[in-house]
Amino acid sequence: MGNITVIVITAFVASIVGYILRLIYAKLNIRSVEQTSKRVIEEMKLIAETKAKEIILDARLIVDRERKEFEHKIKERRQFIQNMENKLNQREESLDRKMDAVDKKEKNLSEREKDFSSKEHLLSVKFSEVDKVKEEQKKFLERISGMTREEAKKILISGMEEDAKQCAAVLLQKLEQEMRENADKKSKEILSIAIQRVAADHTADITTSTIQISNDEIKGRIIGREGRNIKAFEHATGVDLIVDDTPESITISAFDGIRRQIAKIALERLIADGRIHPARIEEVVKKVKKDMEQHLKETGEQAVIEAGVPCSNLEIIKLLGKLKYRTSYGQSQLQHTLEVTWLAGAIAGELGLDVMFCKKAALLHDIGKAVDHEVEGTHHQISANIAKKYGESHKMINAILSHHEGFEVPSSPEAFVIATADAISAARPGARKESVERYLKRLEKLEKVVKEFRGVSIAYAMQAGREVRILVEPEKINDNQTQILAHDIAKKIEQELEYPGQIKITVVRETRVQEIAK
């Protein structure tokens, strides 16, 4: 029992002691928590103060930066406004000056207007006086002559009618003479062939081509029924086709070398093909003309290679090709051009000048002769215009214009080289025949005079210049106007050209209508 009591007392005391110890421990924990809380609060305050300071510092930096940017923008804006004010001030000053000038001009105009008004009034008075004088003179003339104005008009018209009758009489005489020539057509044909044969000794090498045929039966097929084939051929090619009694040969005559070559090739193809009629003739001639364009291009390219001058301009190359069929005083113009090119290059090399410039100028110096029968002007000017068109220098143009004396003074040593080389090529023995050139010039001028008339599309000088065949545009010239056109052309030829004998004017107006049957 005593042990139990001791145990109970011990347990009680132990519980009391444990309770007291828990109280003491709790108090100690509370103090520790309070201290920890105070320490945490102090640390948080310190962190908050540091963060606040950083935020304030950043804010100050941002404000400072924004302030500087704002001040910079304000400064730029003020500068812009200042510049605008300066410009406005300048414009105001300019406007003031212009207004002053306008005021002066208005003042001058008003003064001129007053002056013109006074002069106009004076002129009106003068015109009135002149009209009065004219009326007085008319009355005086009527009184002296004893005729009225209507009577004078009748006399004038009567004189004009008399002149017209005289012109009609001359025309009638020409028509009668032409009828007599047609009546003796065969003899005239033989005479023209004889003239061609005589001229051939002097010009056959440049104005005629002969085609050999296997037999004379082909001549009849070439002539065609009532000569329609030969007429169609001459019409399409612009040459004279001479079919005479010379065995197994046909002669083509034309002063234009390209026409003559086209006619020769076309006739050879027609003979080889065997089909010879107007439609086929027109078809073959058209094809040969197209082939001739390619041939001229190839000839020009070969000439450029032989000359040793680089050239890629297709038009220049074609014009050089045309020079192959152009002669000057009987001398081949392409051969002359190449000779001048080679001579100019050699001379320039010896003198230490620009060799390529001299060779190119020599190549172009006579290129206008390829089109001088189509374009107005001397061949010097035409050549210079072509060079200028394709961007050549003033020095080059001067060298071209000055290669003959009397046109332009040479402005460079190279220009003298071109003139010298041209003179050497032209002056060599046997190079030229002056009478041939005079004959060709006359035919070219004859064609040129005819082409000046309105409505003329093509003109061919034929029969050694004794006939001009003219093709007109049917839209511009009607049937009634063809007679007037022929009369006007004849008058102009009589006034401007010198020629032996007579020239027959033939105007052809042709209208074609095509339709396709489907």
Curated annotation (Swiss-Prot):
Endoribonuclease that initiates mRNA decay. This is Ribonuclease Y. Residues 207-270 form the KH domain. It is an enzyme of class 3 (hydrolase). Belongs to the RNase Y family. It is a single-pass membrane protein. InterPro entries: HD/PDEase_dom (IPR003607), HD_domain (IPR006674), HDIG_dom (IPR006675), KH_dom (IPR004087), KH_dom_type_1 (IPR004088), KH_dom_type_1_sf (IPR036612), Ribonuclease_Y (IPR017705), RNase_Y_N (IPR022711). Residues 333-427 form the HD domain. Its main location: membrane. Coiled coil: none annotated. It comes from Endomicrobium trichonymphae.
